[in-house]
């Protein structure tokens, strides 16, 4: 079942003032400075029946990702490419504000930001997913499950997605005399071909202060957030603004600068997670 979150509660003025008093000193809860993301832990191979799976802990935020592969037809406009789709579910146990129901704009936005980031850099070699050109290709479904929401779902979900793609293996298959593709349940097939790695880094503006990787309370007191997609070569490949506040040119430059630095932390965590 898909899950939809309700609107997060507005933080009381006293909470915002408490955060501002810390920010004026250059600090945040958890002994972080403004530019430092929370601790990142990535565990792969947690779901036996998935082609790839991972659990990401970004502070107290936890996201599980899994990828399954099936055989299907390619899109008519891309007959020589496989198919990759991303879906996100907000599990009710993750937050008291999440309730059962169809995905709303927040879940859809999360999945689309992850999906667009992958497509912008051509993260997965979709041509390598072709089984029979124009007829049969691998269809990959990446499912994201938010199981503990303590802020910054974008970065945790993007890390989880990259972790599963980097460790996934396609199933083995055989082709029958009639042309039917038969997937074998025994043994592992080829590794998924990932051409480029990409992460997102979320920054938030609270009054005049810019912070990296906001927790749930910082999100509640923030005026606006910017999600910056960065590839492994340090290129900015996507931007997504959320929230009703405004950003100056100087704000955006600061946010991008912070994001480029923080992305190095995320890429290092990914590299450590996929080491044999």
UniProtKB/Swiss-Prot annotation:
Subunit: Component of the archaeal exosome complex. Forms a hexameric ring-like arrangement composed of 3 Rrp41-Rrp42 heterodimers. The hexameric ring associates with a trimer of Rrp4 and/or Csl4 subunits.
GO BP term (any one): rRNA catabolic process
Protein name: Exosome complex component Rrp42
SUPFAM superfamilies per UniProt: Ribonuclease PH domain 2-like, Ribosomal protein S5 domain 2-like
Organism in which the protein naturally occurs: Aeropyrum pernix (strain ATCC 700893 / DSM 11879 / JCM 9820 / NBRC 100138 / K1)
Domain of life: Archaea
GO molecular function: mRNA 3'-UTR AU-rich region binding
Function: Non-catalytic component of the exosome, which is a complex involved in RNA degradation. Contributes to the structuring of the Rrp41 active site.
One GO term describing the cellular component: cytoplasmic exosome (RNase complex)
Principal localisation: cytoplasm
Compartments, record wording: Cytoplasm
Gene: rrp42
UniProt KW keywords: Cytoplasm, Exosome
InterPro entries tied to this protein: ExoRNase_PH_dom1 (IPR001247), ExoRNase_PH_dom2 (IPR015847), ExoRNase_PH_dom2_sf (IPR036345), Exosome_comp_Rrp42_subfam (IPR050590), PNPase/RNase_PH_dom_sf (IPR027408), Ribosomal_Su5_D2-typ_SF (IPR020568), Rrp42_archaea (IPR020869)
Gene3D superfamilies: GHMP Kinase, N-terminal domain
Keyword set includes Cytoplasm: yes
Family per record: Belongs to the RNase PH family. Rrp42 subfamily.
């Amino acid at each position: 079942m898909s899950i939809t979150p309700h609107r997060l509660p507005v933080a009381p003025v006293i909470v915002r003032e408490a955060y501002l008093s810390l920010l004026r000193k250059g600090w945040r809860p958890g002994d972080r400075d403004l530019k430092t993301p929370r601790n990142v832990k990535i565990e792969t191979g947690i779901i036996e029946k998935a082609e790839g799976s991972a659990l990401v802990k970004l502070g107290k935020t936890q996201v599980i990702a899994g990828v399954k592969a099936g055989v299907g037809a390619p899109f008519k406009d891309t007959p020589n490419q496989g198919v990759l789709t991303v879906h996100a579910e907000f599990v009710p146990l993750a937050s008291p504000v999440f309730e059962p129901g169809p995905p709303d704009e927040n879940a859809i936005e999360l999945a689309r930001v992850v999906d667009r980031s992958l497509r912008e850099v051509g993260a997965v070699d979709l041509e390598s997913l072709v089984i029979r050109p124009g007829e049969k290709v691998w269809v990959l479904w990446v499912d994201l499950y938010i199981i503990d929401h303590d802020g910054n779902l974008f970065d945790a979900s993007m890390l989880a997605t990259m972790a599963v793609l980097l460790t996934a293996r396609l199933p083995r298959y055989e082709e029958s005399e009639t042309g039917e593709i038969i997937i074998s349940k025994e043994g592992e097939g080829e590794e998924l071909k990932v051409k480029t790695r990409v992460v997102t880094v979320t920054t938030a503006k609270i009054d005049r202060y810019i912070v990296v990787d906001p927790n749930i309370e910082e999100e509640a007191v923030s005026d606006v957030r910017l999600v910056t997609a960065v590839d492994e070569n340090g290129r900015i490949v996507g931007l997504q603004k959320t929230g009703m506040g405004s950003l100056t040119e100087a704000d955006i430059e600061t946010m991008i600068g912070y994001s480029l630095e923080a992305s190095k932390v995320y890429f290092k965590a990914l590299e450590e997670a996929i080491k044999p």
